[in-house]
């Protein structure tokens, strides 16, 4: 939608401080109270054409305008800005405040109080955030075990942080809250995990005692590449894959058929699971994999 001429161009799509633009003479308080402007936070506005209720970037920009000195975006908000798929729809913006800082509460804001040394702060896309290392460190020691692992895997996948560096960073901070959870997460973290649901499926199988398994295993026959599978027991030629909704698309479906036929010709058995299997029928999924493992081991033994 075209921006009306009376709307200053630099205020058309990004949040801004109301007091600042009024003092500059760009708008008046009466105009800001009109239907063209949305009040996001105290003294923070955005034009209605730039407003999206679930636009996390917009909310991060708005919150940044209200942040006290030495306070930055953190947690899942920082991870999302680094490109990690860890954010739920309508999630609040997470910020980390030094112990002495103050910030007015708001439903779209989640405040974490923690020491925040200079070396743990950086910029991404012009916004102040915790560094990738600090972001992974924080997410890996809070929340549920599965969500902590999902977040760490996602950041590792984006290659904004390396697992050895994260382990060293954590080892230097053994007394921080959540350290036992973080140690467990780092022991299971997998940089090759390609999606949050793949991480959940892998953890489900590991917790059931079905490991060890290999992530993103390349299947080859006679030196020729056949396919790469999500999770595998290479010696047994058994693979487990997570299928997201994109596998329903016609072109993707056709590629899947050809790929599965090639794996079958190479002597592999492939089990495929969806989000419903992992989240709603985990026991059935585990039982199916356990049975397949037993059958493949029996075949290998007989050979």
Q: What do these predicted regions represent?
A:
Residues 9, 15-20, 24-26, 69, ...:
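Surface segments flanking catalytic/ligand-binding clefts of nucleic-acid enzymes
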Residues 1-180, 214, 294, 301-303:
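Short gly/ser-rich loop at a beta-strand->alpha-helix junction or flexible surface loop bordering the NTP-binding
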């Amino acid at each position: 939608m075209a921006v009306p001429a009376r709307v200053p161009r630099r205020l058309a799509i990004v949040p801004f401080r109301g007091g600042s633009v009024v003092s500059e003479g760009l708008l008046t308080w009466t105009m800001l109270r009109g239907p063209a402007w949305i009040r996001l936070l105290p003294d923070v506005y955005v034009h209605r054409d730039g407003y999206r209720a679930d636009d996390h970037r917009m909310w991060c920009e708005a919150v940044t305008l209200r942040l006290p000195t030495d306070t930055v975006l953190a947690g899942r908000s920082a991870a999302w800005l680094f490109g990690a798929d860890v954010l739920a729809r309508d999630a609040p913006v997470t910020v980390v405040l030094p112990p002495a800082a103050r910030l007015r509460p708001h439903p779209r804001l989640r405040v974490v109080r923690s020491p925040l040394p200079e070396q743990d702060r950086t910029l991404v896309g012009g916004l102040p955030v915790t560094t990738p290392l600090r972001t992974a460190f924080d997410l890996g020691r809070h929340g549920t075990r599965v969500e902590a692992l999902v977040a760490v895997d996602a950041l590792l996948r984006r290659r904004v942080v390396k697992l050895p560096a994260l382990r060293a960073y954590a080892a230097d901070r053994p007394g921080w809250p959540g350290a036992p959870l973080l140690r467990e997460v780092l022991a299971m973290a997998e940089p090759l995990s390609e999606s949050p649901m793949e991480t959940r499926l892998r953890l489900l199988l590991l917790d059931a005692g079905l490991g060890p398994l290999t992530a993103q295993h390349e299947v080859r026959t006679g030196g020729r590449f056949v396919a790469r599978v999500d999770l595998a027991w290479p010696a047994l030629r058994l693979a487990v894959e997570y299928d997201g909704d994109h596998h329903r698309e016609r072109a993707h479906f056709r590629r899947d058929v050809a790929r599965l036929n090639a794996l079958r010709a190479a002597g592999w058995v492939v089990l495929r699971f969806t989000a419903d299997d992992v989240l709603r029928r985990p026991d059935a999924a585990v039982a199916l994999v356990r049975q397949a493992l037993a059958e493949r081991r029996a075949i290998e033994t007989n050979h």
